Amino acid sequence: MSFSAHTKDELARIEGLPSCCRLAELAALAKLNGRLVHGPAELLIVTENAAIARKVFKALKMQFRLAARVEIRRKPRLKKNNEYLVRIGNQDGLGPALEEMGLCTVSLRVRPGLKRDLVRRECCRRSYLRGAFLARGSVSSPRGSYHLEITVGDQRMAADLSGLMRKVGLEGRLSPRKRGWIVYLKDGEQVADALKLMGAHAALLDFENARVYKDMRNRVNRLVNCDTANLGKTVSAGVRQEEHIRLVVQRFGLETLSPPLRQVARLRLQYPEVSLRELGELAQPPLSKSCVNHRLRKLEQIAEHILASRTRN
């Protein structure tokens, strides 16, 4: 099961909501996954998740005392998945329920956008967001890129949902798609906040663990790359210094050098690959990095004079 499916499964099992929050969650599910059929009036809510279908069935009964029937169907193209259709037939109370959920007016005309009365409270905003995610949402595995999105049918609903996200501290962005719009979050902190707001605490824990692991892996990779680059610079500098010292020795002889320069020259000829700090630790008595660097620069200056004299001649 994917991370997105695990998250939905967890959210679908949240129970014990107060009436206002249950209404907000159910309204979002019906708004995004529902379809109103006329003559006689009938509401159809479709989902691929059995737990979501059970949630809708129970919420309709508890909130409005509406009778519903759940039908299981095979999807025509993807045979591996079932499709669950919650059918609410024409009955007393259906019209007022549709109006209360913001699906239509009293005269059963389709109502666009989000009904503001549903999300006046902070708790109801979170519940509506949870319902919208259960209906048409998805979240990427945190082992990849950070991305959470909710697909809606029109720009008005997308703008309303983005505005709802802003009220709970989320920066939902809009993007048009071939068959509608998406409201999405890209930042890792924003995705984590959304999971927390919706109540997906187990998914949030998995998300944060994966984020920590990925951040640590990236940090280690950066350090390794940095160490590799530094090692390359150290080796290149050591080889250059070795060549200069051999030039000086060939021209003047090692014994003609002063004891301090002779000591460092011998160490560098013996250990061309080590860093200045390590070279200083090999000396007896040990030398500081700056001291080793100063002596090697002296030797390189002598070598440069030799090369310059050759050029003039």
From Swiss-Prot:
Biological processes, Gene Ontology terms: cell division; regulation of sporulation
Molecular function via GO: DNA binding
Pfam families xrefs: HTH_WhiA (PF02650), LAGLIDADG_WhiA (PF14527), WhiA_N (PF10298)
Residues annotated to bind DNA: 275-308
Keywords: Cell cycle, Cell division, DNA-binding
InterPro entries registered for this protein in UniProt: Homing_endonucl, Sporu_reg_WhiA_N_dom, Sporulation_regulator_WhiA, Sporulation_regulator_WhiA_C, WhiA_LAGLIDADG_dom
Family listed: Belongs to the WhiA family.
Role according to the record: Involved in cell division and chromosome segregation.
Protein's name according to its UniProt entry: Probable cell division protein WhiA
Lineage of the species this protein comes from: Bacteria, Bacillati, Bacillota, Clostridia, Thermoanaerobacterales
